Amino acid sequence: SERPKRVFNIYWNVPTFMCHQYDLYFDEVTNFNIKRNSKDDFQGDKIAIFYDPGEFPALLSLKDGKYKKRNGGVPQEGNITIHLQKFIENLDKIYPNRNFSGIGVIDFERWRPIFRQNWGNMKIHKNFSIDLVRNEHPTWNKKMIELEASKRFEKYARFFMEETLKLAKKTRKQADWGYYGYPYCFNMSPNNLVPECDVTAMHENDKMSWLFNNQNVLLPSVYVRQELTPDQRIGLVQGRVKEAVRISNNLKHSPKVLSYWWYVYQDETNTFLTETDVKKTFQEIVINGGDGIIIWGSSSDVNSLSKCKRLQDYLLTVLGPIAINVTEAVN
């Protein structure tokens, strides 16, 4: 199905309010056709990101390799009521306006609802889930145990993510809600150094319509790394935007695809993207059917006067001019 033609918007999701103490207000952002929250609030009228909101079950790492359980540790052991109550408290505290009509971003990255995808620092949730079943059924073989662990984990992971989204939508009806980073693609990773998404992940995305059907916006992350070649950086963006657009096209309501983009290299956060990388990654988002870009920044990008000045300079000389060119060309 053809995607609805939408205005291509670029959003500012950078905590530059931290620069106000140095009398740097970043008012120039809006001169470049970039949508910014009024007063440069971080959680504001245009966009609000909520980091690890509520009380999602999770195993939180402590210093000595140990971890502590939060709300049961894994979704199948968690208490949904506690979580949802805390979620609304967080929302009301951070952004009390019930008429919020911007983009609401839930940034939850402790585990993924697809059991297989919990690797790296998420793997403890997988191991913990397997241990729970093994303790219950000591005579079962490894395969049976893993299958059961996977089934339980995925059922309740879905429950937590879905109910959270529904509650967000119910209490902030006019906002466009989505989870940061989804759909995942796992391209340009050490085992998959190609633009195309991991095939298994694409099948798993197809099975996640329960999530995407409830989202008004898809928010793939297209942060690039310096260790990649310039062509690989473009490939990373291409594959991730394409996959999100593919998912959107398969849904009746064709949610918007807004790509999360960071102005520094993910593996070299003191280095701004080159002008060429900015141009090419922005173009790639447009070419592959994206509906916009969310420029993200970390608080550690703006926690000193010199960093604030550097970012402002970069905005005025590189990022801003490219942003206005792209929006004017597309719209």
Curated annotation (Swiss-Prot):
The reactions it catalyses are:
Random hydrolysis of (1->4)-linkages between N-acetyl-beta-D-glucosamine and D-glucuronate residues in hyaluronate
Entry keyword annotation includes Chloroplast: no
Q: Which sequence ranges form a coiled-coil region, renumbered to this chain?
A: none
- Give the sugar-modified residues: N79, N99, N127, N325
Q: What is its EC number?
A: 3.2.1.35
Positions of disulphide bridges: C19-C308, C185-C197
GO CC list: extracellular region
Tell me the tissue specificity: Expressed by the venom gland.
Pfam entry (one):
Glyco_hydro_56
Q: Where is the active site?
A: E109 (proton donor)
Q: Which PANTHER family match?
A: HYALURONIDASE (PTHR11769:SF35)
Q: What is this protein called?
A: Hyaluronidase A
